Amino acid sequence: MEYFNVGKIVNTQGLQGEMRVLSVSDFAEERFKKGSQLALFDDKDRFVQEVTIVSHRKQKHFDIIKFKDMYHINAIEKYKGYTLKVSKDNQGDLQEGEFYYHQIIGMAVYEKDVLIGHVKEILQPGANDVWVVKRQGKRDLLLPYIPPVVLSVDVPNKRVDVELMEGLDDED
């Protein structure tokens, strides 16, 4: 079965079995909602077990979650440093114009049919995502995911077409 990374357990939270998760999910509210099924992977990326979320809340930059049948710190402490993943079957459906991070990362980015680079990371600093584009011989380009900049995303062909607004590329 294919799994996709959605977060890392960085610490425990209190004594009642809550865990502090650093999310890398594109849809954290949906991914960590009550009843969601996730998989735990150890620090060597080996499958450990399936888990069901019974509670979720945001606290600062973390998602605080609790798993079914794990209601005490002693039951969860061993999972610090583990990765949470979602199976391909549990990803859910997307709306038009929505994409999963794993679909975007690695895509080739073009401006006027000239290759700029490849998406290496997606940041969530505020109102819109920012795609980090790795370029040959230049610093990474921070590309806001907004309509005037990102013209088209072709998932099957792993291609993004953009129009760089003035000031976006400080190396020109």
UniProtKB/Swiss-Prot annotation:
Q: Which organism is it from?
A: Streptococcus pyogenes serotype M12 (strain MGAS9429)
Give the location in the cell: Cytoplasm
Q: How does it assemble?
A: Binds ribosomal protein uS19.
One example of the protein's molecular function in GO is: ribosome binding
Q: Which residues form the PRC barrel domain?
A: 96-168
Q: What does this protein do?
A: An accessory protein needed during the final step in the assembly of 30S ribosomal subunit, possibly for assembly of the head region. Essential for efficient processing of 16S rRNA. May be needed both before and after RbfA during the maturation of 16S rRNA. It has affinity for free ribosomal 30S subunits but not for 70S ribosomes.
Query: Can you tell me which family this protein belongs to?
Result: Belongs to the RimM family.
Q: What is the name of this protein?
A: Ribosome maturation factor RimM
* InterPro entries linked: PRC-brl_dom, PRC_barrel-like_sf, RimM, RimM_N, RimM_N_sf, Transl_B-barrel_sf
> Which is a Gene Ontology cellular component entry for this protein?
ribosome
Report the domain of life of the source organism: Bacteria
- State the gene name recorded for this protein: rimM
Q: Which PANTHER family match?
A: RIBOSOME MATURATION FACTOR RIMM (PTHR33692:SF1)
Q: What keywords are annotated for this sequence in UniProt? A: Chaperone, Cytoplasm, Ribosome biogenesis, rRNA processing
In the record, biological process GO terms are: ribosomal small subunit biogenesis; rRNA processing
- Pfam families this protein is in? PRC, RimM
Entry domain remark: The PRC barrel domain binds ribosomal protein uS19.
